[in-house]
């Protein structure tokens, strides 16, 4: 529909930029490059799908790395990106969930929801243990320091370790999931969410 034209252009730019800038060999090798002690530690927390969760976290970081590059290098397309972010990340239902007591119990689903939307102006970095540390690890304000998909993977790996360190001793109910939700699987991630400070920021020029 015409009203979704800008969103469609923004999404096409996002996906095209992935093809140009992302190294998908990292994903092919991910089962070999995730250290065994990390997956073993996750199993002790009842998490059997740690590689899938790390892959989702990588996607979050990589999306923002890629989008930041395009946002800065092609200013004429910024409005298309903003339209895409408004549709996928500034939805009123997301705002409401972030401001409520939903996703405030330390679980994989809670962390993934809060991480995916961590750039939202309604983000509460105190909602989950370690969420502020995860935000700092991502370093959205200096995301352009990440020069490769492998750099993004290493950040995602550290984020995963922070999540694991804050989960209850046993979380068997999360072991059957894939660490993602509909928003994660269907939509791209914001490319510029902050300035490296403790306060979430929206994409700006």
Regions found by a protein language model. Give the residues of each.
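Short, functionally important secondary-structure microenvironments
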Residues: 1-205
């Amino acid at each position: 529909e015409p009203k979704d034209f800008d969103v469609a252009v923004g999404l096409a730019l996002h996906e095209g930029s992935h093809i140009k800038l992302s190294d998908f060999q990292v994903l092919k090798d991910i089962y070999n490059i995730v250290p065994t002690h990390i997956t073993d530690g996750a199993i002790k927390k009842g998490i059997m799908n740690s590689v899938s969760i790390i892959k989702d976290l990588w996607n979050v970081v990589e999306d923002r790395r890629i989008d930041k590059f395009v946002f800065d290098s092609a200013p004429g397309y910024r409005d298309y990106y903003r339209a895409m972010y408004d549709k996928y990340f500034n939805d009123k239902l997301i705002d409401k969930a972030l401001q409520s007591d939903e996703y405030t119990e330390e679980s994989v689903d809670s962390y993934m929801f809060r991480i995916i939307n961590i750039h939202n102006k309604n983000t509460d970095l105190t909602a989950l243990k370690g969420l502020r540390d995860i935000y700092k690890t991502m370093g959205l304000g200096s995301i352009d320091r990440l020069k490769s998909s492998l750099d993004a993977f290493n950040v995602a790996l550290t984020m995963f370790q922070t999540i694991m360190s804050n989960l209850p001793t046993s979380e068997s109910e999360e072991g059957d999931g894939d660490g993602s939700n509909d928003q994660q699987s269907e939509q791209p991630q914001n490319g510029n969410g902050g300035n490296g400070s403790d306060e979430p920021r929206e994409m700006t020029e």
